[in-house]
Amino acid sequence: IMLADPEKNQAYADLVLQHVEKENYDGVILDLSDNTGGDMGPMLAGLSPLLPDGTILFFQDVAGNRTDVQLAEGSLSMGGSAVQGSKTKVQSVPIAVILNERTASSAEIVALAFKTAENVKYFGTPSAGYTSGNSQLRLYDGTILQLTTASLVDASGQEYMNVPIAPDESSDNPLRAAVEWIHAQ
């Protein structure tokens, strides 16, 4: 999702929150296949009840300096549009994340954020590999130049610089594999 309107960004996060905050499910399947990215802020805010508070990933510059992306009570620091998520945390449930070769950019950031959660397993095929942090520079004529300025580092310390995220279980039918895994938990 890439919306320039803060109200629409918040509305997107709120719509996701309506479904995530329900407590009548035994597991979550987060299907990021074909999600080509956009703004990580609304996506992470909407999914914030499923993520633990704290550092969810890092941006690392060429000198090795890291800037952490923090989630605290539904608010995200250092990444995407300022959107408010939820302070409520959902009970611990198994979370299946589905990836494919079209899971890209901020959708890959969302996938990496779930490496901080417990009982998560990744299914499908490797992601697109647009795993980097970008900065925007507005030029004199209003044109925006997007520059890759950082790699991504997940909570375990693994660095991703334009490399795909590999699933834990490769599958031609990742939805079925995810459902079977959740039922087995």
For the regions a language model picked out, list residue spans one by one.
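Extracytoplasmic/secreted envelope proteins and their assembly/folding machinery
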Residues: 10-17, 40-48, 92-95, 107-111, ...
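Flexible, low-complexity junctional segments that flank or bridge functional domains
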Residues: 1-58, 75-76, 183
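Low-complexity, Gly/Ser/Thr/Pro-rich intrinsically disordered linker/tail segments
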Residues: 161, 165-185
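Gly/Ser/Thr-rich loop/hinge elements
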Residues: 37-94, 132-136, 145, 149-155, ...
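Bacterial peptidoglycan biogenesis and beta-lactam-recognition machinery
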Residues: 52-59, 115-124
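C-terminal soluble interaction/assembly domains
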Residues: 124, 130-140
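Short, surface-exposed connector motifs at secondary-structure boundaries
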Residues: 25-28, 90-96, 117-118
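Active-site-proximal beta-strand/loop segments in catalytic clefts of secreted hydrolases
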Residues: 1-3, 31-35, 60-62, 98-102, ...
